[in-house]
Each structure stands twice: as structure tokens, then as C-alpha cells.
Amino acid sequence: MPNIKIKAIDIYHPNHVIENDFYINHFQKKGRDIQHFLEVMGREKRYVIDKVEENGLTMALEATKRVLERAGMTGKDLDYIEFSTQVPETTFPINAMYVHAEIQADHDTIIKDSNANCAGMTVAVEQASRYMLANPHIHTALIVGSDYNSLIANPEQEITYANYGDAACAVILEKTDENTGFIDASYHTDSVFKDKINYPAHGLTKAVKGKSDVQAINWLPFDGNVALPPTYKMIDQLLARNGLSIKDIDACCFSQFALSNILKIQDHYQIDQEKIIYVGDTYAYTGTSSPFIALYEGIKSGRIKRGDNVLFWTIGSGFQIVAMLYQY
């Protein structure tokens, strides 16, 4: 029986770095002290686009070219391309069309864009893995996740403005006879917070017709801790149905949205520190690509090796949580 493995992974981020002092000073001028907030979120610096010629699409193109080079492949070797983003540079055509053109992929290559907000790239990899297992004609897939977060971050709200960074990540999935790769995934969706994080703030229709602001995300306060009990239940069920325990997990690549969330999950399961891959202090929160940038850095540092069981966990606005098991 075939399996789907991660053949290669690479990233791209802008060169421009902004450290915490900029945001501390920005909000001090508004009469707010965000130093404790930055500590809770685990922020130190972030990469932010500062060139007019850069955007979410250009970042994705660069990450794509890098991962193809790393894998020793060309666009002609790809059967499937999926672009995960919540900040698409265009909606007509889809962003994946530009990726297809840039790498000169074949005419029979399937292409699509997808959006599951911050859970997007994890969802895309999970769905592509299952599709590849079901379709005998699909042997390779490119999944690229890219969000130009700073473009729509709200300078009046530290939860986005001081918390987000810009980056792209690309992975190559490959069908293999090796006993490795995709294991399983589980979802939990509760739409209770559907009106708490909005962009455009009042919908596309009003934004296009000039009846509301389209410049930034509007984020209303809510208690994100409600996502933790279903997270624990979901992870427990996912491990149990695959004959695993938390001790069998070699590395954890979680959403980098908030260090506090990672620490709560770590404490709940008593996960060893060396298994927690944290990159939010360097990259801040990169949205859709977040858990996979953690994977990239874990591999790069030697903390994640071939054969390791990796647990992914992430959350999308609204909210939807996703946990995925992959043997790297």
C-alpha cells in the first residue's frame, strides 16, 4: 500500500527585520503598554515586507523555486499544486496559476487555491495527502502557504500589528512504498467566534462599494482558552486510533500564534522541551505556514530526523482546530 511522504521543505521570508521596540513605542504613543502581551505571545522579532515589489505571491514563488531545487525537481515533475493563503494577491486568476506559470508545470497538472485561515497549510497538506492516496495518477504535489500578514495587520490592535510576520513555506509531497509519511488527522469546528476576526471587517460587498474600511483586520476580544479542551480530546482520539501515545511523538510543530498556547499543551501532556519546536520568537506569527516553518527549522537544526513522528496542531479563526500526524 502506498504512503505519502514529505520529500522536501523550504521557506522564504523578507530581509527586513522589526524588533519589539518598534511596536512598544508605537502603542506607548497611544497610551498602551504591550510589553506583557509580547511576552505572553513569545515575540522578539519578525520579518516584514518593506519593498513594493514583494507580496504574498512573490514570497510563494521564491519558496517554491527553493523547494524544487532542494528536491532536485522541476515544475514538470509536479502532478498537483495547491496554494494556501488567506491574503491572496488575486482572486482572478487563482494564485496557483502564477506558480504554475513560473515553474513551467505541465498542462495536466491540477492547480488550486485554498483558504482555511491560519489552519490553511495544515489542512492543505492533509487533504492533498488523502487525495494522492485515492488518485492513482497523482504521484507528486507542491503545497505552498504564504500570507502577507503585515499588509492587513491593524495598527490600532496589537493582536495583529505586533504579533504577525510575513513568510512563505513550500513542501513537496511524494507517493512512496516506504513505510513512512502521512498517518492521520482530526478536526474540531465550533463557529462560536465567527464574528470575532473579520477581514474585510464588514464583508467584501461593503468594502468594494466604499461603505466600509478595507485596510485592516478587525479583531474583537474573545477567550481563546475555549479551544484547549477540544484540542486535548481531539489529540487523544487521534493518537488512540493510531495505536500511539504522546510518548511516541518525537516533535511537535504547533501554531506559533501564541507561546502561551504551546506551553499549555506542553504542560497538559508533559511533553519534553526538546520535542517542542518554537520559532515564534524569530518569525512571529506567519499565519497559514506557521506549523510548517516550525517543521523546517526543526529539520534544519537536526531536532527532527527521518522516521520521526511529528504532531501538528493549529487553529483557524472562527474557530477550527486541526491535529495531524506525519512520520517525517
Question: What does each model-found stretch correspond to?
Answer:
Residues 57, 61, 87-88, 101, ...:
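Claisen-condensing/thiolase-fold acyl-transfer catalytic domains that form or cleave C-C bonds
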